[in-house]
């Protein structure tokens, strides 16, 4: 009986370790973030009109879903890629000011970080340095979108 309990304990610890490693892999620090002129409010939050990569899977989601969060393209160093990232949410923090915003991944990019909608970029750029430099340095973590 004791052997069975030890086995169960080992399995439980292994599962917890794997889950913690997965959670750690779902965030990144000191990531370069640029901006993109999606301006979804001007195109009725239409992913097809924005030519967003995720339109194939998410364009027919309800309007409330598409406008709940600001948009971003994702090509960060940690987290799922391609279709697996579509519709997921990130909490993005400007490392210079601590300002945070939650965004929804609607597109992919190639800059190795994030390409935030200009509205979100401006919301995070509270000291104006991002605009001056053409990019922000941010941390991000995948979060529940609560949809």
Curated annotation (Swiss-Prot):
It holds the Pfam family Barwin. GO terms for cellular component: extracellular region. Induction: By TMV infection. It comes from Nicotiana tabacum. This is Pathogenesis-related protein PR-4B. Its main location: secreted. PROSITE patterns: BARWIN_1, BARWIN_2, BARWIN_3. Disulfide bonds join 54-86, 75-109, 89-145. It comes from the Eukaryota. Residues 1-25 form the signal peptide.
């Amino acid at each position: 009986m004791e052997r069975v309990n030890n086995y169960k304990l080992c399995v439980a610890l292994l599962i917890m370790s794997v889950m913690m490693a997965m959670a750690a892999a779902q965030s990144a620090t000191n990531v370069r973030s640029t901006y993109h002129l999606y301006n979804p409010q001007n195109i009725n939050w239409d992913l097809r009109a924005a030519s967003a990569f995720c339109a194939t899977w998410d364009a027919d989601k309800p309007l409330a879903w598409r406008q709940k969060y600001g948009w971003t393209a994702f090509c960060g160093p940690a987290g799922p890629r391609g279709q697996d990232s579509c519709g997921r949410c990130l909490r993005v923090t400007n490392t210079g000011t601590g300002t945070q915003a939650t965004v929804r991944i609607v597109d992919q990019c190639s800059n190795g970080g994030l390409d935030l909608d200009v509205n979100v970029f401006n919301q995070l750029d509270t000291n104006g340095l991002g605009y001056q430099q053409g990019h922000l340095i941010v941390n991000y973590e995948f979060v529940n979108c609560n949809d």
